[in-house]
Amino acid sequence: MCGIVGIVGHSQVAPLIVDALKRLEYRGYDSAGVATIEHGELARRRAEGKLINLERRLKEEPLDGTIGIGHTRWATHGVPNETNAHPHFSDGVAIVHNGIIENFAELRDELVRDGYAFSSQTDTEVVAHLVARELAKGLKPVEAAHQALKRLEGAFALAIMFKGDEDLIVGARNGPPLAVGHGDGEMFLGSDAIALAPFTNSITYLEDGDWAVVRRDSVAIFDIDGKKVERKRQQSLSTSFMVDKGNRRHFMEKEIHEQPEVISHTLAHYVDFVSGVSKPLDLPFDFAKIGRLAISACGTAYLAGLIGKYWFERYARLPVDIDVASEFRYREMPLSANDAAFFISQSGETADTLASLRYCRKAGMKIGAVVNVRESTMARESDVVLPTLAGPEIGVASTKAFTCQLSVLASLAVRAGVARGVISQEQEKTLVRALSEAPRYANQVLKLEEQIERIARELSRYKDVLYLGRDTNFPLAMEGALKLKEISYIHAEGYAAGELKHGPIALIDENMPVIVIAPHDRIFEKTVSNMQEVAARGGKIILITDSKGAAQVSVKTMETIILPDVPEIISPIIYALPIQMLAYFAAVFMGTDVDQPRNLAKSVTVE
């Protein structure tokens, strides 16, 4: 969601802050701003919309100063406009904030009674006034910030700057991530390491309840009680990646085309392609001894987990409980310390997923984090990190992270099957061999781009689309619908094909394209029956299948996308690509902001 950057430097910082904020655009935002200290006074520039608007403003009205804070805002309290954009000021205090102050209404009423006037609708301005009130009592800036922090409830990350002090930024974290970057005679704050990549790869991650006093040549970190604490300084892996589109129009397009490579990297971490066996993993539990596996995630990661459920139950006979993270911890389901739980998140910072992780931690369960950022909060709070080696994913709509999550889960399901005695050594080799073929098949699918683009052009003319699938293709149908609606804004729904007659069939007519995901498998004929029901009502069928399915289907289709004949275990990985490409090209034809669709954020760090 919101992105935070702070720099205590030795040259003009405003352009550097904007550059760092660009690296946080993937998180989603609707306004942006920068504040510096010019000649001892606070100065700021803010703009609604994209960073290019802020850049224009800074070109017209440059900001001097060697210290500054910047922010990209994703609206929670108050509409997206310049007035609500950060940084917010109050009597010599400048602040940027990510998260939600849950007791903001109570604090606002208290501050109004004390004579403080509010110029915005945000909860952030409450914090600025709280700090200013403590300064007015005679406290020094650091202590004023500390006292204000003790009044806050909720999930937040903050960066605070003070008029007249060009060698101080106070940062604080309680939920959303915040990192300190160590430079040579300069220091940095950022929502993640990617923002700080141009400046440093030496990072200290704040933990929940931490607040930091950041100066040019030092950082001191304290807990909420003011006790000094030590946090590990580490080299960030994220800084090794350049964030650019290459020769592609959008990050999403680039990331779709990176999938053969990153799937290969991810699989190679978990299986040995040469010997045909799963690689040993230092897991905190034994697959053979647990009675159940819990999985929780949000959005696309949840759908990856749902496919993982099929795999674990099929290949390892391991029962899986799965739910979206926002519901998981409210179900009051029985949890056992003898079982394990996997939590899936690209960023490793998803608030609901992190809350579910902590819920299972309290129950004594062993925790695995399937994440794309090894330094993330979820990774640090888990017993084992199960990395997806996708590299930074900038497009808000997940593509390569999704297929890498599937690659991890498929590999783990094979390992679990071996450990539980369900899979023989020969079967393991067959499955690992199948997994090793996934990158090659993914490359073949990408060569269908011209056909898929043509189909997407036709698809973009409709207002509603239905996706159908059975077995692992049911979650894929939901993923296809999610992709289409989140970036093209075309209404779409994904259903289990067998549920068609239980409601969705009422919507079928000549204005309803139906995308059917149906490789030629043991239930192919059942899906064909559902296609016949659609055809009988005038629905326009787009079939995604393989050569066997295309040869045997008896129903007339509007279009048929023929994929390679692939082994069952990698089918969801390979069939994910055409649904991503359909959504991408449909969005291009609709003229939407593909990489940063409206109202969405890449990293959802509030519940």
From Swiss-Prot:
SUPFAM superfamilies, per database record: N-terminal nucleophile aminohydrolases (Ntn hydrolases), SIS domain
Tell me which residues this entry annotates as catalytic: 2, 602
Q: Does the keyword Protein transport apply?
A: no
- Enzyme class, one word? transferase
PROSITE patterns reported for this sequence: GATASE_TYPE_2, SIS
Q: What is its main location?
A: cytoplasm
Q: What is its EC number?
A: 2.6.1.16
Tell me the disulfide pairings in this chain. none
Which Gene Ontology terms cover its molecular function?
A: carbohydrate derivative binding; glutamine-fructose-6-phosphate transaminase (isomerizing) activity
Catalytic activity as recorded in UniProt: D-fructose 6-phosphate + L-glutamine = D-glucosamine 6-phosphate + L-glutamate
Question: Which part of the chain is the SIS domain?
Answer: 283-422, 455-597
Which residue range or ranges hold the Glutamine amidotransferase type-2 domain? 2-217
The subunit field of the Swiss-Prot or TrEMBL record says: Homodimer.
Main function: Catalyzes the first step in hexosamine metabolism, converting fructose-6P into glucosamine-6P using glutamine as a nitrogen source.
Which PANTHER family does this one have? Answer: GLUCOSAMINE--FRUCTOSE-6-PHOSPHATE AMINOTRANSFERASE, ISOMERIZING, GLUTAMINE--FRUCTOSE-6-PHOSPHATE TRANSAMINASE (ISOMERIZING)
The name under which this protein is listed is Glutamine--fructose-6-phosphate aminotransferase [isomerizing]
Q: Lineage of the source organism?
A: Bacteria, Pseudomonadati, Pseudomonadota, Alphaproteobacteria, Hyphomicrobiales
